[in-house]
């Protein structure tokens, strides 16, 4: 019954889902992902069921899968072989974030840090990283410091031609470093550099921490595991590390733009501490850029599983009788709960793909050794946008999985739905690489720094240029809802920038110091400013993509998707739009919500085909509720029957207990 029904919904679509997939992802990307999936299907180590593995089992299987991926030799450098790398990491992210993390932390985080902050003296190490002759980890976070990177406490002191690393307190112990607990042979570690009694500030270093033959830690280094975590993160070796007079060669300093001379003098070509920090910030952005994709993938899973299941699930109908029950996807409320996340999955993908292109250009310029004011500005803009997009994407992703689980009713709570595991897997995306509310402050700090330059703001990615013109208040709706939404966002962002800046000035004039001012402007002002700027950029970039799209046959449905995504996001700012004076009276809000309801309804005939265009292969999806054949009940029962007549040992005790109770009641 279910399969023909899902086919019926597929036939409602006005477009070819394969063409849409190719248009959004690129034909080569789709082909490469299919090759990766085929390789995974052919290897028993990638086959799985719905059992919950122990921590040791998870780490063992992640290790074996990682070995197999390395043996495939699909890529060496994520920047010179970008398409292969993204095809592999996206497929692995969908399959298991634990396996993906093992690969990503080594190549894309550790490797990128050494490349971007190192020099020729680190070439041998870079080569070993690319050849997977070593395993890398990235050690920034400490027990007592995460987001406040400038105040980390680990020290690296220059002494007789070497660097001596120390952990001065419990709060300075490095932690949350993936790959560190058991596997890492080398790490990028951040510490305060002390030369001739002076603290030269926050610097990056690369050091060996284990012997690659015995895997024993080197003298002066203690490494341990951080214990159990929910979901796939059990498979990630998050470790802690403590230094006690560990000596490393001077070459450990990642010396692009700074160095220590043989006679012990600190030298730097950076013009300021902020310029030096911007290079590090650009490096840190790579992690946040990857986490944006996690938000996209979460929305993809949520909408795929819940929408497909909503076709198979029939409940109630206009007249009594089981034969008259209708799919729950027909209910407008079910559509309203799920379709916005379907639109988010597609739009965030388009946005993230463009952002990756910009970031790759930025990183290549850094690696080539360029130093310019324009590149420094590029770094700040990358940092501002990644610090805004990571929270927006991950909040949507985690939210979508929670809504999907509830929209699937009781069956959604089964392990075989995969929705619960996915919620556990994606929940930490809101805190790692920067707690969301904290890093939004980094976005607003950069935007507020532009407040005095309105009229002449120029940035490499042009994400802030709209602030140069004072926007108008709402007058009327046009025939293009996306243009209307962007106009509202421009007003909202401009107004929030002006009012937040004015409030900061007022607080400073009242005697508050900069720290107090920065904290007091966050609620309802700076946080909203960062979110508005980010969402405007997301919508604008997707609109640009649609203007340039080659396959015109899929443009109309993508326009419907963008209409829904933009209206869905803007509706969340409705109260602020009224408070700021963008509109008055109830009609603007009523019209906005009516347009949102219509945008949801317009997507119903397209929904299953849109899901097909974004859904991973069933082997990767691994959900009984969300399989592409629409046979949810059959897949559920297939799993149920695996547990037929399995009697646990305690049933004998139960029988004896009931017998005693029965005998007692007769007395």
Curated annotation (Swiss-Prot):
- Provide the tissue specificity: Expressed in intestine.
> What modulates its activity?
In contrast to other acyl-coenzyme A oxidases which bind to and are activated by ATP, does not bind ATP.
Say which domain of life the source belongs to.
Eukaryota
**What's one GO-annotated cellular component?**
peroxisome
Q: EC annotation? A: 1.3.3.-
Q: Which reaction does it catalyse?
A: IC-asc-C7-CoA + O2 = IC-asc-DeltaC7-CoA + H2O2; IC-asc-C9-CoA + O2 = IC-asc-DeltaC9-CoA + H2O2; asc-C13-CoA + O2 = asc-DeltaC13-CoA + H2O2
Motif Microbody targeting signal in this chain: where? 665-667
Give this protein's Gene Ontology molecular function annotations: FAD binding; fatty acid binding; flavin adenine dinucleotide binding; pristanoyl-CoA oxidase activity
Q: What is this protein called?
A: Acyl-coenzyme A oxidase acox-3
Q: Which gene encodes it?
A: acox-3
Cofactor dependence is on: FAD
Q: Which residues form the active site?
A: 433 (proton acceptor)
Q: Which family does it belong to?
A: Belongs to the acyl-CoA oxidase family.
Q: Which Gene Ontology terms describe the biological processes this protein takes part in? A: ascaroside biosynthetic process; fatty acid beta-oxidation using acyl-CoA oxidase
Sorted alphabetically, which Pfam families does this protein's record hold?
ACOX (PF01756), ACOX_C_alpha1 (PF22924)
Q: Which residues bind FAD?
A: 138-141, 146-147, 178, 313, 334-337, 410, 435
Indicate yes or no for the key word Flavoprotein.
Answer: yes
Q: In which pathway does it act?
A: Lipid metabolism; peroxisomal fatty acid beta-oxidation
Which EC class is the enzyme in? oxidoreductase
Its keywords, alphabetically, are: FAD, Fatty acid metabolism, Flavoprotein, Lipid metabolism, Oxidoreductase, Peroxisome
Q: What does this protein do?
A: Involved in the first step of peroxisomal beta-oxidation by catalyzing the desaturation of fatty acid-derived side chains of ascaroside pheromones, which regulates development and behavior. Specifically, shortens indol-3-carbonyl(IC)-ascarosides with 7-carbon (IC-asc-C7) or 9-carbon (IC-asc-C9) side chains and contributes to the shortening of ascarosides with 13-carbon (asc-C13) and 15-carbon (asc-C15) side chains.
Location within or outside the cell:
Peroxisome
- Gene source species: Caenorhabditis elegans
Q: Which Gene3D superfamilies match?
A: Butyryl-CoA Dehydrogenase, subunit A, domain 2, Butyryl-CoA Dehydrogenase, subunit A, domain 3
Q: How is the quaternary structure described?
A: Homodimer.
């Amino acid at each position: 019954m279910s399969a023909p029904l899902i086919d019926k919904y597929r036939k409602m679509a006005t477009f070819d889902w394969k063409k849409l997939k190719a248009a959004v992802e690129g034909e080569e990307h789709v082909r490469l992902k299919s090759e990766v999936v085929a390789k995974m299907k052919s290897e028993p180590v990638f086959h799985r069921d719905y059992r919950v593995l122990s921590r040791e089992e998870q780490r063992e299987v992640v290790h074996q899968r990682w070995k197999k991926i390395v043996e495939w030799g699909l890529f060496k450098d994520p920047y010179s072989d970008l398409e292969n790398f993204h095809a592999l990491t996206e497929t692995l992210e969908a399959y298991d974030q634990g396996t993906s993390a093992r690969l990503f932390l080594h190549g894309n985080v550790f490797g990128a840090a050494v490349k971007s902050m190192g020099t020729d003296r680190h070439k041998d190490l870079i080569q070993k990283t690319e050849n997977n002759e070593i395993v890398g980890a990235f050690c920034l976070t400490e027990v007592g410091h995460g987001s406040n990177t400038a105040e980390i406490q680990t020290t690296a002191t220059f002494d007789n031609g070497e660097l001596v690393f120390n952990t001065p307190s419990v709060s300075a112990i490095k932690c949350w470093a993936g790959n560190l607990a058991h596997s890492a042979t080398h790490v990028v570690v951040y510490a305060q550099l002390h030369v001739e009694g002076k603290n030269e500030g926050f610097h990056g270093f690369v050091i060996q921490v284990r012997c690659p033959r015995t895997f024993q830690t080197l003298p002066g280094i203690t490494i341990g595991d951080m214990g159990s975590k929910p979901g796939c993160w059990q498979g990630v070796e998050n470790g802690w590390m403590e230094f006690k007079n560990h000596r490393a060669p001077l070459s450990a300093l990642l010396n692009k733009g700074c160095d220590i001379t043989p006679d012990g003098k600190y030298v730097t070509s950076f013009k300021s501490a902020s310029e030096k920090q911007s290079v590090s910030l650009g490096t840190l952005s790579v992690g946040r850029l990857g986490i944006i994709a996690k938000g996209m993938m979460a929305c993809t899973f949520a909408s795929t599983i819940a929408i497909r299941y909503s076709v198979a699930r029939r409940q109630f109908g206009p007249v009594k009788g089981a034969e008259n029950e209708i799919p729950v996807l027909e209910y407008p409320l079910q559509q309203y709960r799920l379709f916005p996340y379907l639109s988010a999955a597609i739009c965030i993908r388009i946005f993230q793909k463009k952002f990756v292109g910009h970031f790759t250009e930025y990183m290549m310029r850094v690696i080539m050794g360029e130093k310019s004011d324009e590149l420094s500005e590029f770094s700040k803009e990358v940092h501002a946008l990644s610090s805004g997009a990571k929270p927006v994407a991950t909040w949507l992703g985690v939210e979508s999985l929670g809504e999907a689980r509830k929209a699937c009713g009781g069956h959604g709570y089964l392990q075989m739905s995969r929705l619960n595991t996915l919620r556990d897997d994606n929940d930490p995306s809101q805190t790692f690489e920067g707690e969301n509310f904290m890093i939004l402050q980094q976005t607003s700090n950069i935007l507020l720094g532009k407040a005095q330059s309105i009229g002449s703001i120029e940035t490499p990615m042009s994400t802030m240029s709209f602030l140069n013109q004072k926007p108008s208040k709402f007058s009327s709706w046009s025939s293009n809802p996306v243009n209307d939404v962007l106009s509202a966002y421009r007003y909202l962002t401009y107004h929030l920038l002006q009012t937040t800046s004015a409030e900061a000035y007022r607080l400073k004039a009242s005697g508050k110091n900069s720290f107090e001012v920065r904290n007091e402007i966050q609620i309802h002002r700076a946080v909203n400013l960062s979110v508005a700027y980010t969402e405007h950029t997301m919508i604008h970039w997707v609109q640009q993509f649609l203007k340039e799209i080659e396959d015109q046959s899929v443009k109309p449905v993508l326009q419907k998707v963008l209409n829904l995504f933009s209206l869905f996001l803007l509706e969340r700012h409705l109260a602020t739009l009224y408070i700021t004076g963008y509109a008055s009276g109830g009609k603007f809000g009523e019209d906005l919500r009516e347009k949102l309801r219509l945008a949801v309804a317009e997507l119903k005939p397209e929904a299953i085909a849109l899901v097909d265009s974004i859904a991973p292969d069933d082997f990767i999806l691994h959900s009984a509720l969300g399989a592409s054949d629409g046979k949810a009940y059959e897949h559920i029962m297939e799993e149920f029957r695996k547990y037929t007549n399995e009697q646990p040992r305690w049933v004998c005790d139960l029988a004896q207990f009931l017998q005693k109770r029965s005998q007692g009641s007769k007395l």
